Regions:
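N-terminal secretory signal peptides that target proteins for export/translocation
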Residues: 1-14
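Generic extreme N-terminus detector
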Residues: 5-6, 18, 36
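Bacterial N-terminal signal peptides
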Residues: 17-29
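N-terminal Sec signal peptide cleavage junction
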Residues: 29-35
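Secreted/extracellular ectodomain signature
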Residues: 35-49, 55-224
């Protein structure tokens, strides 16, 4: 008595399904290989989230917080304070938890003597119109445009999912450079530095206090 074999087409389909399933399993394993590299909340760890974000992330300027908190000597990570802040934001961009994973232009939301944040539109040509609203990590609108962010916010940074911690700004209300509280241009810890509030949506959100530069705080970065 001979045994009947299943049609070749069926066997081929099964093999193909197993191969493609194994391929996607390897990809997902590599994407989230270790909790030391990617946290559970890191959207860059999820292939599904990456595809979803590219398709669905609305246009805008996205804010994210650094994963690390820093003392006020923020100039220690580059040749100048501006260069150092950019390096900090670029490094932390990799692990930023936000729905827009494809943005590539990164800047620190920190004022310096040469680059006050209110003037980023002129200095760095960031989009400053209602087609590029300022958004939180999940896409919620914080301000209708970059300029509109300084008088007040539509929602706090905590409500927008950006951060629940105070953060270095070295700024006055309105986004100007705080010439008094800036940790001596981010060079020492023996001074004071201006910080912002995650729970204030008034004009004071950029200046909620000026603690000693020995304290550690994250900084907020933008990406578009």
């Amino acid at each position: 008595m001979s045994c009947k074999t299943k049609p070749f087409g069926f066997n081929h389909a099964v093999k193909f399904f197993i191969q493609i399933s194994f391929f996607f399993f390897i990809l997902s394993t590599n994407a989230c290989m270790s909790s030391k590299v990617c946290s559970d909340n890191d959207k860059n760890c999820s292939i599904q989230e990456q595809i979803y974000s590219i398709i669905s992330a609305p246009q805008g300027i996205y804010l994210y917080t650094t994963q690390t908190s820093y003392q006020g000597n923020l100039a220690a990570y580059g040749s100048t304070l501006d260069d150092s802040l950019h390096n900090i934001c670029t490094t932390n961009r990799i692990f930023a938890s936000m729905i827009n994973t494809s943005c590539s232009n990164v800047l620190p939301v920190v004022s310096t003597s040469t680059s006050p944040m209110y003037n980023f539109g002129t200095l760095y040509s960031i989009p400053d119109n209602t087609s590029y609203p300022v958004r939180g990590s999940k896409g919620g609108i914080i301000a209708n445009s970059w300029t509109n962010m300084f008088p007040s916010l539509l929602m706090t940074l905590e409500q927008a999912g950006v951060t629940s911690q105070t953060f270095w700004t070295f700024a006055n209300t309105g986004g100007t450079y705080n010439s008094a509280d800036n940790c001596i241009d981010g060079t020492i810890v023996g001074a004071a530095g201006a910080i912002g509030s995650p729970t204030d949506n008034s004009t004071n959100w950029l200046l909620s206090g000026a603690p000693g530069c020995t304290e550690s705080h994250p900084i907020i970065c933008l990406c578009y």
